[in-house]
């Protein structure tokens, strides 16, 4: 399939550009490169991240805040991070501040508790997001506003809030919800309505669906396209990032990588042909800094590669089998894979589950990822292994029914209406999903439970909820809590029961985001069991100059993980065949038994 190279035309670019896609496909790099191209064409551009796990700072090599910051060396380009936690704190203070000194301290504390849930973080970030679109004054000094949006699940929720909260405000009668006084939202009614209109205006807004030449990423882009189109965002284009072509006909690794990409693109041809589609070639280096961003969209740069240095010795790492052998000694417990979107959490979780099951253990593999690709990675059955997905819609409906049955029976019509209204809040979904998460962890007392968790930002919100959860349930007057809910945080903090594996790629952003996640876990008194460096090209034997450049660039990050971040590290090589289904996962397990990097001695 002959697809054009992605280019940004300043003459036809809409004022608002959104980049979305499966975690790890390159949304940040492409949004930054696009903003750079527009600015260098003389446009005034504001680049914005609304991602709780934003790595915009790292790509731009500039410390950003929630106010526009000029990017050195690029006149006309400003960038900012909408930090959800900071936005939530500001939102709480905006609502509570005027009441200080007027209400008793106990009442103020109660309000703060009601505004401490994760959906307050969501709506506060959305509040700033809408201001940039719906308020003509907010971005009046810019020709273009480019949004580096979050991994897909979060993006869909962020987009859908525009309609969901507009409808909620239309039907609300109580003036309060788990978000606190609705007056804080109602003041922004005109801005919200303008945002909804702008998102649906093809002359104002373009949605750039970013994908990779991989089946899961392209399937996710297609799903996202349909859902956002249903939300009214119809002006869409697809960019397939990291497309690889080799000039080395005898290179097994290069040919396998090229063949895999071609097969994925051909399988998605109907979707690709349904909207404007372009590609970005794979580059030999990680995209960091302004110069790296220029290389990303430079058609002549694909052959640039640095020579491999002599004398570099790889750090000692373990095999995945070493970790599983240690894990299985306990006989039961919970294994959780965490990390940036797109690093292979699902694949590693599925491989561990298959390895444990093949060793005769009872294993349950479950996903809390809104994108839920685990079924695609494990498209078959293994004796002793069961599989489930935590479905937010089903869990929310079940939770709503349970609360209505427990509380609503003794209420009058007005009371039931108020309760129903409160349960329509987005916070209810977080609680319902959290309950399901706790239930899965609780099952680890008599078997192994492997949790394929969501990308970093969502995972942190999920873990954060563990301490805020009890307060929120008390607010909804639940009389008793399941034992697994009450014991969850204790179990997560027990290293003999819960093993958390931080999954990363040997690249700058995945490594540094995994390190940040490790610090967040440690602040919650949760210690990771090990790191897993996935998809390494080290010792691939490739003679392709571009892949040699990729291999050279990953060496510093392999060394950094072992020397700086991890006390225990496993290494997984890049696989010529994409590991989907139990047979391929078994082969991945076999390959990890013979790591090219020497195994660390106990």
Specify the residue positions occupied by each region the protein language model found.
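Conserved catalytic network of the ASCE P-loop NTPase/AAA+ motor domain
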Residues: 10-11, 37-41, 71-74, 135-140, ...
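Walker A/P-loop NTP-binding active-site region of P-loop NTPases
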Residues: 18-82, 149, 159-163, 342-395, ...
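Hydrophobic "anchor" residues on beta-strands that sit immediately upstream
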Residues: 47, 144, 208, 237, ...
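P-loop NTPase motor core
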Residues: 47, 54-120, 372-424
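Switch/connector loops and helix/strand junctions flanking conserved nucleotide-binding motifs
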Residues: 54-59, 87-91, 153-157, 218-219, ...
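Phosphate/Mg2+-binding loops and adjacent switch elements
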Residues: 100-223, 410-509, 513-516
């Amino acid at each position: 399939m002959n697809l054009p190279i992605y280019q940004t035309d300043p003459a036809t670019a809409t004022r608002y550009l959104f980049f979305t896609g499966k975690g790890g496909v390159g949304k940040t790099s492409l949004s930054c490169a696009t903003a750079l191209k527009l600015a260098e064409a003389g446009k005034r551009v504001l680049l914005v991240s609304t991602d709780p796990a934003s790595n915009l700072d790292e790509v731009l090599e500039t410390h950003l805040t929630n106010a526009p910051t000029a990017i050195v060396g690029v006149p006309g380009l400003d960038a900012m991070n909408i930090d959800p936690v900071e936005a939530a704190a500001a939102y709480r203070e905006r609502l509570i501040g005027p009441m200080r000194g007027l209400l008793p301290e106990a009442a103020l504390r109660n309000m703060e508790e009601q505004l401490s849930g994760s959906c307050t973080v969501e709506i506060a970030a959305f509040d700033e997001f809408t201001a940039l679109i719906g308020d003509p004054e907010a971005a009046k000094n810019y020709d273009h506003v480019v949004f580096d949006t979050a991994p897909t699940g979060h993006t869909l929720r962020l987009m859908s809030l525009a309609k969901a909260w507009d409808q909620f405000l239309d039907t609300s009668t109580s003036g309060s919800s788990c978000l606190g006084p609705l007056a804080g939202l109602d003041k922004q009614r005109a801005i919200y309505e303008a945002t909804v209109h702008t998102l649906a205006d093809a002359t104002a807004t373009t949605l750039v669906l970013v994908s990779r030449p991989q089946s899961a990423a392209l399937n996710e882009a297609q799903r996202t396209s349909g859902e956002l189109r249903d939300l009214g965002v119809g002006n869409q284009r697809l960019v397939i990032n990291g497309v690889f072509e080799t000039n080395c006909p005898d290179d097994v690794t290069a040919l396998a990588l090229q063949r895999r990409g071609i097969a994925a693109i051909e399988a998605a041809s109907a979707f690709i042909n349904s909207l404007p589609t372009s590609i970005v070639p794979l580059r030999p280096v990680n995209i960091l800094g302004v110069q790296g961003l220029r290389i990303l969209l430079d058609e002549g740069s694909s052959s640039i590669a640095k020579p491999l240095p002599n004398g570099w010795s790889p750090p000692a790492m373990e095999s995945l089998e070493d970790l599983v052998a240690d894990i299985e000694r306990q006989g039961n417990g919970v294994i959780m894979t965490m990390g940036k979107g797109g690093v292979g959490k699902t694949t590693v979780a599925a491989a561990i589950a298959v390895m444990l099951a093949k060793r005769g253990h009872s294993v349950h593999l479950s996903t809390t990822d809104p994108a839920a690709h685990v079924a695609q990675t494990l498209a078959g059955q293994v004796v002793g292994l069961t599989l489930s997905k935590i479905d937010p819609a089903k869990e929310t409906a079940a939770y709503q029914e349970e609360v209505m049955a427990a509380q609503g029976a003794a209420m009058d019509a007005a009371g039931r209406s108020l309760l129903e209204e409160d349960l329509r809040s987005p916070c209810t979904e977080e609680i319902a999903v959290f309950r399901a998460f706790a239930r899965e962890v609780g099952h680890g007392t008599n078997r192994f439970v492997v949790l394929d968790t969501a990308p970093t930002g969502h995972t942190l919100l999920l873990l954060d909820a563990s301490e805020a959860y009890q307060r929120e349930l008390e607010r909804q007057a639940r009389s008793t809590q399941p034992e697994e809910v009450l014991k969850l945080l204790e179990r997560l903090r027990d290293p003999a029961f819960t093993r958390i594996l931080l999954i990363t790629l040997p690249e700058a952003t995945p490594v540094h985001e995994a390190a940040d996640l490790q610090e967040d876990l440690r602040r919650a008194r949760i210690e990771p069991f090990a790191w897993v460096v996935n998809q390494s090209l080290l010792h691939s034997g490739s003679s392709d100059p571009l892949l040699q450049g990729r291999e050279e660039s990953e060496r510093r990050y392999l060394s950094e993980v072992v020397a700086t971040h991890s006390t225990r590290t496993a290494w997984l090589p890049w696989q010529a065949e994409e590991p989907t289904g139990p047979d391929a996962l078994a082969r991945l397990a076999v390959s990890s038994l013979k790591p090219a990097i020497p195994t660390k001695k106990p």
